[in-house]
Amino acid sequence: MTDDDRIKLEPSWKAALRGEFDQPYMHQLREFLRGEYAAGKEIYPPGPLIFNALNSTPLGQVKVVILGQDPYHGPGQAHGLCFSVQPGVATPPSLVNIYKELQRDLNIPIPSHGYLQSWAEQGVLLLNTTMTVERANAASHAKKGWELFTDRIIQVVSEQCPNVVFLLWGAHAQSKQKLIDGTKHLVLKSVHPSPLSAYRGFIGCGHFSRTNSFLEQRGLGPIDWALPPL
């Protein structure tokens, strides 16, 4: 049995990514993670949620891709969806700014929580390009192999899905534009919603209304960006 037969992954993604789990980089990543766990380090998100973005948004249902960098590194925050936090956790500053732009753009009231699962279930792939992190140690799992895996995910979406909107916020996300076929998809770029940069172009970008206009023009249902109460 190959390694990818043991990975608990939504079937359409498992088929599309078949073979990735047997690549040398993935063996190296797996050994790195085993070593971190064996050393008693606390790794986020919890193991069953590492692939939550893929398991929540099957490949054939992807309408929008939002790219993050690595998971939140505070206790109880990360659950495998970029920018999102688990119920009961304070909304992080970048997500507060995303909500401010949603309110400005679409007049959507600012939610009382930061749990974006409903976006994922509507076809918004909330993908961190590094999928794990050590507690209180930002970017600790960068350049360990995850980026090769998530680059392949972006390529698969570009190749196999029609009419996807890619929202690339900040330089790191924009570095992935080369993986996307701009003749098939809509690529929208702005600065990152971080408090350090949000008011230099993220607030006012109109990405949410532009996303829905693009989807509706192609006969696809818009995203309901309003989050249900918890």
UniProtKB/Swiss-Prot annotation:
Q: Which reaction does it catalyse?
A: Hydrolyzes single-stranded DNA or mismatched double-stranded DNA and polynucleotides, releasing free uracil
List where the protein spans the membrane. none
Give the keywords, sorted.
Cytoplasm, DNA damage, DNA repair, Hydrolase
Q: Name one GO biological process term.
A: base-excision repair, AP site formation via deaminated base removal
Q: Which Gene Ontology terms of cellular component type are present? A: cytoplasm
- State the active site: D70
State the similarity comment. Answer: Belongs to the uracil-DNA glycosylase (UDG) superfamily. UNG family.
- Describe the task this protein carries out: Excises uracil residues from the DNA which can arise as a result of misincorporation of dUMP residues by DNA polymerase or due to deamination of cytosine.
State the HAMAP family in the record: UDG
Name the UniProt record assigns to this protein? Uracil-DNA glycosylase
Q: Which organism is it from?
A: Pseudomonas putida (strain ATCC 700007 / DSM 6899 / JCM 31910 / BCRC 17059 / LMG 24140 / F1)
Originating gene: ung
